[in-house]
Amino acid sequence: MGFRLIHPDDFEWKTRAHEPEEPPRHVAELSEPAGFAHTHANVWRYEPGTGAKGRPHKHKVQEETFVVLAGTLSMYLDDPPQRQDVPTGGIVHVEPGTPLQAVNHGAEELLLYAYGTPPESERAEILDSAV
């Protein structure tokens, strides 16, 4: 038995690569501080503006669940990509092998909890951008 509590003030935010003309996105990696052994989780912040976006990708074995904590997530799913707008409180579950790309088209910051299982030993396959 046991538990771990991670307070938002304790998040260690890292800025991820982005195109020079795009707003940056930031990640707080939670798997290690939470002690996850069989899952993977992050909190993402996408700045508002001209479309901060994640990398388009797909996983071989990992399924991912996204919970929108603030803002509106524009998730491009499948091949060809179909845009799904997900409001605050909404959830998107993505099965392994499904192409996806997360984007913030809104004027507000997007805050997103991303959870995946099982954790993959190799990186996701990076695809061409949907936007």
Language-model features and meaning:
Residues 36-37, 47-52, 72, 118-121:
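Short, charged/polar surface micro-motifs in flexible loops or helix N-caps
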Residues 31-40, 51-65, 79-80:
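A short beta-loop-beta micro-motif enriched in histidine and acidic residues
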Residues 3, 101-131:
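Double-stranded beta-helix
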Residues 54-55, 75-76, 84, 94, ...:
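Short beta-strand His + acidic residue motifs that chelate non-heme Fe in jelly-roll/DSBH
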Residues 42-44, 66, 113:
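Conserved hydrophobic/aromatic positions in well-ordered beta-strands
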Residues 60-88:
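A short beta-strand-loop-beta hairpin characteristic of the jelly-roll/cupin
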Residues 1-40, 47, 123-131:
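A short, N-terminal "cap"/entry segment at the start of jelly-roll beta-barrel domains
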Residues 49-51, 88-89, 95-97:
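Tight coil/turn sites that cap or link beta-strands
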